[in-house]
Amino acid sequence: TVSSNYINVDEFMSETQTADTNTTASELETVAETGVIVIPQTIDFKLNASSKKIFFDDLVIENLNGKLFLNQGRLQLQNTNFSLIGTKVNMSADYYAENPSKAVFDYTINATDFDIKRAYNEVKMFREMASAAEYAEGIVSLKYKIGGVLEGDMMPNYPSLKGGGELTVKQVKMKGFKLFNAVSKKTDAEGLRDPDISKVTIHTTIKNNIIKIEPFKFKVAGFRPKIQGESSFDGKLNMKMRLGLPPLGIIGIPIKITGTQENPIIGVGKQTEDLEEKEYEEGKTPAINQEAIPPIVKDTIN
């Protein structure tokens, strides 16, 4: 077991040397640059680790406890718990630096009831991967598994990322989110402007620079939007929305969303009526009247 009050992970980052073309070979200038964390190949051990405070790339991680494995330059964390941005996080991770400017990683994370605005402001990777959080204030939870390549600045190479999981919205206020506000303007649905969203779980997958958003529904100001589609890490949109109208959402407006997050393009179709869904309940759902079903007529060939 290893215990520490303070660890600065940035000290393990690589440094590269570059030569100033205006100097001779004997006057090489050493320039410190950020590189990936390289773990020495000679280290081989397993331990239970705990630390009161860890500094890593502008993050402050507190009260870390977990199992740590180091072997031939590879780091593994198993069932590790810590506090970050005021919330408890559980994480398992696998990390290996192929060279000073490239590392591969894979991790599973579970963070419950955290402040989405604080996460956007303080966690660089969250800010890059969830840019819409810039316009959100409130509480969400995250369960996600993702892997890929980290480059020299310890940020992901986005086309390399692959994973999936869910974001659960407990209570969030969207302010100035251009997608919702553009839909609001196009459909005269004022309730969609700066909406309050609650009790929604959004499932997504990531592959080849694309975030795929599985269909999800929510209620806001009497409307019942249903959204699905894709967005890319460079902000492009290809999404569908059905805006269920008050009071029950049975009548809805189909909407096509393209363009970018900064400049969404909204296409509106004609109102349609949804088919009523009915879940089967043992002993409660009326049985089909078989006598009312017309017989199957078979075609005959003469």
Predicted feature residues:
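Compositionally biased, intrinsically disordered linkers/stalks adjacent to structured regions
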Residues: F216-F218
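Short, charged/polar, low-complexity loop and linker segments
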Residues: I210-I211
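Membrane-proximal interfacial segments on either side of biological membranes
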Residues: T1-K199, H203-I206, F223, Q228-N302
